[in-house]
């Protein structure tokens, strides 16, 4: 279930209710990712499963969204949900299944991305595609420079963030890859992006669990700019 994520993603359609009136127990996560009791900010209107989304399409060879015969039809440890207002589209990190899902406003699957093509040496398979590994964060934005739609992904266990274009319902192409900065200013031993966003100038801001000095900032060309 992704009730907590949908509560945030569909906030505009939900109503604030008193804690005592909630038909369920609300929770949040502390620094150690342990669930702790919390007051509810919104009432959940709907919960959605992989079956509701139509994820069985991903294992149907006759479907244009076919990924593989054993593509999971269930969600696994979904970590992030982003709503693209310009295109009325939801994007989800189905983290445990190492993939990104694109959904319509009825939360039906319209795209599934397990990786991308492009120039990288990280997690590249025999087919030349680089695959995602436990992606935790996603952000989608249309560029003011070229009017293209870019998808920014915090590819956590591959120790990178990526910027991609969407080519079809199953294919992405790499535009820019962001890895651990090679500078003394970045003194953490690891680079483990968990959340990501971009501004109008296409600077990106990456939240890393191993960094406590702010988000890691890169410019449009992938150069480390410091912390924000």
Language-model-detected regions and their locations in the chain:
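Sec-dependent N-terminal signal peptides
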Residues: 1-10
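Eukaryotic scaffold repeat domains enriched in small/polar residues
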Residues: 21-228
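Sec-dependent signal peptide cleavage junction
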Residues: 12-23
């Amino acid at each position: 279930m992704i009730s907590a994520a949908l509560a945030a993603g569909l906030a505009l359609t939900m109503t604030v209710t008193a804690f005592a009136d909630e038909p369920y127990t609300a929770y949040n996560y502390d620094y150690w990712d342990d669930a702790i009791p919390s007051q509810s900010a919104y009432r959940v209107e709907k919960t959605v499963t992989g079956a509701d989304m139509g994820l069985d399409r991903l294992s149907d060879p006759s479907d244009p969204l076919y990924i593989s015969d054993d593509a999971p039809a269930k969600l696994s440890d979904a970590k992030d949900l982003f709503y693209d207002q310009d295109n009325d589209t939801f994007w989800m990190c189905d983290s445990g299944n190492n993939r990104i899902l694109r959904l319509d406003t009825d939360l039906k699957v319209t795209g599934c991305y397990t990786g991308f093509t492009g120039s990288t040496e990280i997690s590249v398979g025999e087919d030349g595609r680089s695959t995602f590994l436990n992606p935790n964060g996603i952000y989608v934005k249309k560029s003011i420079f070229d009017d293209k739609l870019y998808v920014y992904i915090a590819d956590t266990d591959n120790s990178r963030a990526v910027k991609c274009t969407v080519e079809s319902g199953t294919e992405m192409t790499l535009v820019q890859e962001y890895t651990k900065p090679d500078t003394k200013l970045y003194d953490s031993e690891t680079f483990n992006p968990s959340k990501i966003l971009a501004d109008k100038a296409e600077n990106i801001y990456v939240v890393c669990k191993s960094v406590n000095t702010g988000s890691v900032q890169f410019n449009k060309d992938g150069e480390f700019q410091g912390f924000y």
